[in-house]
Amino acid sequence: MRIHYLLFSFLLVLLSPLSAFTQSINNPITCLTKGGVCWGPCTGGFRQIGTCGLPRVRCCKKK
């Protein structure tokens, strides 16, 4: 039974840094620091990595 507690604590420590990578981009400053640009639709060689806080304004980054 003690192995369950060890396994749970190991997984908790192992997976806790993943929350830092799943934070959404939702303002222009974060978009720029992540290497993106605030633009309307992401076209051509760009992909959407978040939003810039306004409706229809997306944070786009080159593919």
From Swiss-Prot:
Disulfide bonds join C31-C59, C38-C52, C42-C60. Its main location: secreted. InterPro entries: Defensin_beta-like. Highly expressed in lung. One of its GO terms (cellular component) is extracellular space. One of its GO terms (molecular function) is phosphatidylinositol-4,5-bisphosphate binding. The keyword DNA repair does not apply. Residues 1-22 form the signal peptide. GO terms for biological process: antifungal innate immune response; antimicrobial humoral immune response mediated by antimicrobial peptide; cell chemotaxis; chemotaxis; defense response to bacterium; defense response to fungus; defense response to Gram-negative bacterium; defense response to Gram-positive bacterium. It is found in: Secreted. The modification Pyrrolidone carboxylic acid is found at Q23. Keywords: Antibiotic, Antimicrobial, Defensin, Disulfide bond, Pyrrolidone carboxylic acid, Secreted, Signal. Pfam families: Defensin_beta (PF00711). Exhibits antimicrobial activity against Gram-negative bacteria and Gram-positive bacteria. May act as a ligand for C-C chemokine receptor CCR6. Binds to CCR6 and induces chemotactic activity of CCR6-expressing cells. PANTHER family: BETA-DEFENSIN (PTHR20515), DEFENSIN BETA 4A (PTHR20515:SF2). Belongs to the beta-defensin family. This is Beta-defensin 4. It comes from Rattus norvegicus. The gene is Defb4.
